[in-house]
Amino acid sequence: MEAQKDGVHVTYSLAGEEVCSFFVALRALAESRLLEIEQVTQQYLKERGVMEAVDREALVDRVRNGEVTVLDVRPVEEYQAGHIPGAISLPLGELKRKLTELPREREIVAYCRGPYCVLAIEAVEMLRENGFTATRLSEGVPDWLARGLPVSHDYTKERRHHK
């Protein structure tokens, strides 16, 4: 773990790709040994109506072709520490106010911290309720790093907003 202090706030992040790989492997081990995790997760997602999640490989191609808008709905500090390339920072708490700035002609893919993070699920629900075509990416930045996929960093205090 690494920590970055900014006044009274401390942002913690995973120290590197090796740590991310370990985290993802540990999560996979827990999932394989504790079948209840899968059952609880699937029941929760089924109740929320967001069972499907976009496939990582398909997402990479669709982003490259400009077919989707990718939203990182985590807090801005987490986005700045590392995000999927091309993703737009739009924390869940700001999503409702910014709906008019999002493109309606493209599918929106929301992601957060990983398969057990509910931020992306809530974002997809809100987007769908407001007429958007939306789905979630169940993986987060640690999953991408663990698979050797590129992650962008933005250590400035400015936020990337959708234009």
Q: Regions from the language model: what does each represent?
A:
Residues 1-2:
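Short hydrophobic beta-strand motif reused across regulatory alpha/beta modules
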